Amino acid sequence: MRKRSFTLVASTLGLTLVLPSAGNVGAAELQALGGGGIAAPVKELVAQFENASGHRIAFRLGTTPELIKLATTGGPFDLGVVPREVFADPAAQARFALGPAINIARVGLGVAVRSGSPRPDVSTPEALKQTLLKAKSIATLPESAAGAQVLRAFERLGISNEMQAKTKAQKSPAQVVEAVAQGEAELGVFLVNVLTAPGLDVVGSFPKEVQQEIIFAAALAANTKEVDAAKAFIAYLQTPAATAIIKAKGMTPG
């Protein structure tokens, strides 16, 4: 039996996730774009799909601005599973096939602390506001769809100016986790599924009054030459097997 291996290759824009397949004759090699917030489920989803289909998929993961740049200037790709904010950019939207994108997963914002630290109250807008104001520092990822929603939440709470001075901007979801786990930031404020990581304790999701979910949607690239294989992967993402993985990684399918 051939052993499978996983390789993460750093790039100037996010990460490239390469998962080799069994190499069936005639199998497609797909290039895909993905939001960094779905890195954990994507790894398992691709592995399961490859085992069943024989196709190979290489995912380039990044923030929303990075994905827009990848879509418009990063070379050919076959499909994307990206935050819906990517499709709001006209140049990026033009690189995807006509027709509606299909919602695959969604997740809301939350707050985490270093494991073992006191767990502040974030259960109401006022409690969240006071927790954020009392924190000495927070880690988030402003240059992302989730980070933009964090900043909008600060605006709704009326604390934008105060938070600007104590925000330690990170460059990737993994760095948000690391900053809190290493004690470089008191709070992590980002997607709940990303914050659910070793070294962190999630203290709670944002209250519904200020909560905004990030929706990851799938769409074919306009110029893909592997239409059938790309469609097959998107169809697989909607199966019970795939939605079970999505749920297990702290996200809501659809």
Task: List the model feature ranges, each with a label.
Residues 1-4:
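N-terminal secretory signal peptides that target proteins for export/translocation
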Residues 6-8, 88:
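General helical structural elements
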Residues 26-93, 97-107, 113-254:
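Exported/periplasmic ABC-transporter solute-binding proteins
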